[in-house]
Structure formats: C-alpha cells, structure tokens
Amino acid sequence: VFDGKKLEAGQQIVLENMLFYPGRHILRPESLPELHALLKLLRANRNLVIEIHGHVCCTTTEPDGYDWDTDSHDLSLNRARFIYDYLISMGIGAKRLSYKGFGGTQKIHPDESDETLRAENRRVEIKIVSL
C-alpha cells in the first residue's frame, strides 16, 4: 500500500484493505497484510509520526456506530484504537502514534444508497503528522 508513495506531512492515506467484522472493532484476518505493511513503514521510518483515523458508515441519530464488543457507540474510535494498540504491542513508541474516531461525520459518499458506497465510508486512514 505504501510502496512508491512519497510521504508528506499532512497527507492522509486510506488503508484500503483494513476490514473489521460488522459492528465490531476486531480486525478480520485478511486485513493482516495491510496492518503488517503499516508496521513495516513505521519501522523503516523511525521519525514518522502518524494519527490513525477510524470512520464508519450508516450512522443515524448517534454520532458513532454501535460496537457490540464494548456495548457502546464508539465503533470508529475503537477500531482506530485497535490499530494503535497493535502497533504499540509490536514495539512502535506511543509518542509516534495517536488515534481518533470520526464516526460517520467525514463520509466520502454522503449518499450511502448501495453497499459499495457504504464500504468506502467504512475505513481507516492514517494522517502523516511529521516525518
């Protein structure tokens, strides 16, 4: 995902294959290569500082999606925290990482009339804070 991309402060990159189980903050196994690519990027660029952004689709009256694992409306935050916790567990320093959940407030597609559009709204992005 990061091969050949020039990184710049302020840049946001969508982690294309970061898939979670529906209504949960648990990552699906097929997403591990994407997660490992992010880890490899951080290990190769020791000064890289990132912010992890979680997004969900289909929110109605609540600002964030419902997380069945925590019985709370913090799904996007918990998904971003899942990535954060994994990176910390793999030795990336906490000073290089932060995370935020945006719920459904920053949709790529406000019209979520089909599954393709909804799927693109359910995403994890990283923002390059500094190099």
Residue map of PLM features:
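Periplasmic OmpA-like peptidoglycan-binding domain that tethers envelope proteins to the cell wall
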Residues: 55-131
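Periplasmic peptidoglycan-binding/tethering modules of Gram-negative envelope proteins
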Residues: 1-51, 59, 63-64, 129-131
